[in-house]
Curated annotation (Swiss-Prot):
Its main location: membrane. GO terms for biological process: transmembrane transport. Pfam families: MFS_1. Keywords: Membrane, Transmembrane, Transmembrane helix, Transport. It is a multi-pass membrane protein. It comes from the Eukaryota. One of its GO terms (molecular function) is transmembrane transporter activity. This is Uncharacterized transporter C530.02. One of its GO terms (cellular component) is plasma membrane. Belongs to the major facilitator superfamily. CAR1 family. The chain crosses the membrane at residues 99-119, 131-153, 165-185, 187-207, 224-244, 256-276, 325-345, 367-387, 409-429, 439-459, 472-494, 508-528.
Amino acid sequence: MDLYLLASGRKFGVVKSDCISNNGVNVKDVGNALNEGVVGAIDATRKMVVSLGTVMPEIQKCGVTFEESSEDVSDFYLVRWDSIDDPLNPKNWPMWKKWIVVVQISLIAFVVTFGSSVYSSGIGNVSMDFGVSISVSSLGSCVFLVGFGFGSLPFAPLSGIYGRFVVYFCTLLMFTLFQIGGGCAQNIWTLVILRFFQGFFGSTPLSNCGGTLSDLFTPIQRTYVLPGFCTFPFLGPIFGPIIGDFICQSYLGWCWVFWINMIMGAVVIVIIFFFMPETHGDTILDYKARYLRNKTRNMKWHTIHERQRNPRSAIYQACTDSVSLLITEPIVVCFTLYLTVVYIIGYIDFEGYPIVFAKYSFDQGEIGLSFIGIGIGIVLAGACTPIIYVHYNRVYTRRNGVMSPEDRLYPLFFGSIMLPISMFWFAWTCYPYHPYVHWIVPLISSIFFGWSLLFVFFVSYNYIIDSYQKLAASALAAATLVRYAASGGMSLVGRPMYVNLGDHWATSLLGFISVGMIPIPFLFFIYGKKIRGLSKHAYKL
């Protein structure tokens, strides 16, 4: 007999009935018992649930993740994992199925981050059409990033209550609908407001990716999965101006940057509706309990998670945890600062590159192509993942399955040094009126900028996740809020900075700031264990 997990009329997956019961007892047996009498039904259901309860110690030994509880193990109606090999548990899924989920959240991340930068291609056109200054039309980029930051706070805890799929699907749907509003906007302030909500609902892939990957992969597996995922949210902003500049210089006009983003979002919505399974373990158990209640007509079947659902409390707790970690935890403070600096540099570049390469007589489409170097660097950094994984695996094996969070920091040694080098390289080789310095020279530096960009991001994320574990979602939400809110504000100063300071010193200023970030990975590599030992919240090895 096949068991279909249903929620709101959608089929989430199918497993055989022996995933529900052991000892030869299944739902059909329960149904037959109901026909024979109440006593028989209770007997059958007890036998079925005892089979669930007896495997819990083994689940604990094997490291299968579930919520701890003070619930009495004699609670026969408490739904748990059936065994350590329960195919409903996402950690037991085949690797191909896990990667299908990773690809889908990567596509969502690409679509929403594409939307963060594609608008910058149309800022000049928006300014002319609505009769406002460049600074006012640039608010569309600013408020998107601010909305992106604030959206990270509620959606991470909501995904822990209602499941990952519901949050991904609903927020992407809202993001796509607000693209339609952007394409139809008749004045600048309508457009600015719509851009904020585009960012707000587009924040979920970056705020929830840590939870989704933790649902599916062990920490050592996450070593190669997270960099693979991270290439997409960084390639999105790179392709934004590349495609957007060609759209805006064509007969289509700036409105089509929103229509293109809407089409991309609609395609991904269809894909995830049909192919994305639920990965949150507690939510899957909720579906299992719901099925048993419907099938046996016994309302006593329940999960711990169902009893603890309180959206308001969860959001409040997540917000307070995020603020607390951001104020009191040196690891969160320093790596949030590092990520913020890197993002500020990246989004200022979206304003600065058009100014620099316009002096080389590039047209709008060619200016967009100047971002390809950053994209190449991001892809090359992702290609280094097998080397990094081999290193981590050796450490993991040598230490009998124990890894320190500080072991994650090695790639950042390279990234932290290469970041300022790439900035100074770009700053002092962009001579558009010098016959002996070709435009390709500063563009080559952007490859190393993209490389360091990805290293900083995925190493920081892995280090925070390993350091805070259960509170990692709150720590990452705090980092997301700060870096996007700060990037949004600083994106307004990018164009004036390049105009007033000039190409060389504007980029050099960013380089000097990145020099100040170099000590962070080295200091935490040396003192990280001691800092975690003094923390109330960090994981202590």
